[in-house]
């Protein structure tokens, strides 16, 4: 009986401490981190609204925002040049342009972003960057138990991609689903639309340029969109970066995924280590991409969904909301991959 009493007292104390941390004004910075991290993941924002009022959540969102880039993308700035070069602008340029012997498709770099381990992949030919999609979308009316979602490691094997990262968001009540958020465009056709409203579309045109556009799926296709998904925010447009409202750097800290393109057409996949509450902030991600020559860039789904696969191996360590490792990566619905062109593959194997 005494043991039970002590256990109940311990539970009561723990609950009291949790409420103290969640609501006491002296822990406001930690509370801000909890809210901004939950909102940032886009699929776990219910956590913020469970513990805090809409007014409190909105207060944090407003403080953590950065001003959107007021630029219409100009793809004429992108002049694709896939030939090897031996002159460099700086050390970052040299790191990208110095190709690994025997690998004309991509280069993998292990770097730091905001003090966190990170992975950068430079893909030399943007025509080899294709949208990855899971086996099926919306296989059941119960969004929590859709069976069509797929881990990036399995997507890459099934679709023949040597490199793959996760992409857009999806409906998630804690169990995941196979229902994408927003639009999905594949081979110039809308294969999924959550609604008919304009969204932040991230994709590649028929001439293999990264197009960042606020539009409906059909509007994007009219502008030459080949493959696209919906997510955001846009991080760099025409070399212009956002202005931040506070010193936090926007969107708090978390594991990050971003896609970018340099003016020479080289595509960058950036994936960082972290959790839902630890990892680079958005400014640190942007600064890193700028260093490596990104001219246009966008944020992709981070947190637990964060995945980079190279040659069938998961390169990062995805962690769930509790900080535990997610073996093999989380099941998602979209991503971006390097699928080698058959002609180039034939040339390099002769």
Per-range role (PLM):
Residues 2-193:
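Zymogen propeptides
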Residues 116-118, 147, 158-160, 197-199, ...:
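Extracytoplasmic
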Residues 118-122, 201, 234, 258, ...:
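Conserved hydrophobic/aromatic beta-strand scaffold that supports enzyme active sites
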Residues 127, 208-210, 265, 304:
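Structural signal for glycine-centered tight turns and loop->strand junctions in beta-sheet-rich domains
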Residues 135-140, 216-220, 272-276:
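Short, solvent-exposed aromatic-acidic interface loops
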Residues 163-167, 212-213, 237, 296-300:
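General beta-strand structural signal in soluble alpha/beta enzymes
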Residues 170-246:
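Active-site-adjacent helix-turn-beta-strand microarchitecture at beta-sheet edges
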Residues 175-195, 244-296, 300, 305-350:
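Conserved, well-ordered active-site substructure
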């Amino acid at each position: 009986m005494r043991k039970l009493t002590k256990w109940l007292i311990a539970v009561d104390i723990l609950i009291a401490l949790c409420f103290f941390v969640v609501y006491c004004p002296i822990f406001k910075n930690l509370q801000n981190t909890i809210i901004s991290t939950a909102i940032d993941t886009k699929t776990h924002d219910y956590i913020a609204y469970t513990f805090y009022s809409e007014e409190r959540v909105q207060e944090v969102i407003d403080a953590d925002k950065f001003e959107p880039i007021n630029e219409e993308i100009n793809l004429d700035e992108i002049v694709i040049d896939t030939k090897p070069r031996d002159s460099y602008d700086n050390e970052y340029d040299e790191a990208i342009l110095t190709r690994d012997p025997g690998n004309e498709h991509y280069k993998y770099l292990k770097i730091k972003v905001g003090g966190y381990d990170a992975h950068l992949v430079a893909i030399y030919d943007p025509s080899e960057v294709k949208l990855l999609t899971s086996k099926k979308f919306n296989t059941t009316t119960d969004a929590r138990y859709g069976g069509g979602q797929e881990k990036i490691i399995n997507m890459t094997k099934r679709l023949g991609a040597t490199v793959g990262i996760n992409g857009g968001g999806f409906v998630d009540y804690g169990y995941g689903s196979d229902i994408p958020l927003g639009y999905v465009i594949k081979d110039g056709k809308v294969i999924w639309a959550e609604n008919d409203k304009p969204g932040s579309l991230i994709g590649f045109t028929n001439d293999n340029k990264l197009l960042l556009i606020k539009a409906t799926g059909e509007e994007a296709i009219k502008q030459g969109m080949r493959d696209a998904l919906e997510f955001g925010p846009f991080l760099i447009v025409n070399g212009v970066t956002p202005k931040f409202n506070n010193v936090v750097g926007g969107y708090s800290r978390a594991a990050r995924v971003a896609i970018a393109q340099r003016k020479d057409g080289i595509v960058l996949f950036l994936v960082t280590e972290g959790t839902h509450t630890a990892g680079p902030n958005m400014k640190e991600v942007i600064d890193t991409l700028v260093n490596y020559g990104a001219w246009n860039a966008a944020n992709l789904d981070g947190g637990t969904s964060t995945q980079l696969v190279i040659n069938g191996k998961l390169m990062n360590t995805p962690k769930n909301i509790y900080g535990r490792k997610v073996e093999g990566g989380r099941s998602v619905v979209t991503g971006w991959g390097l699928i080698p062109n058959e002609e180039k593959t034939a040339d390099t194997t002769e």
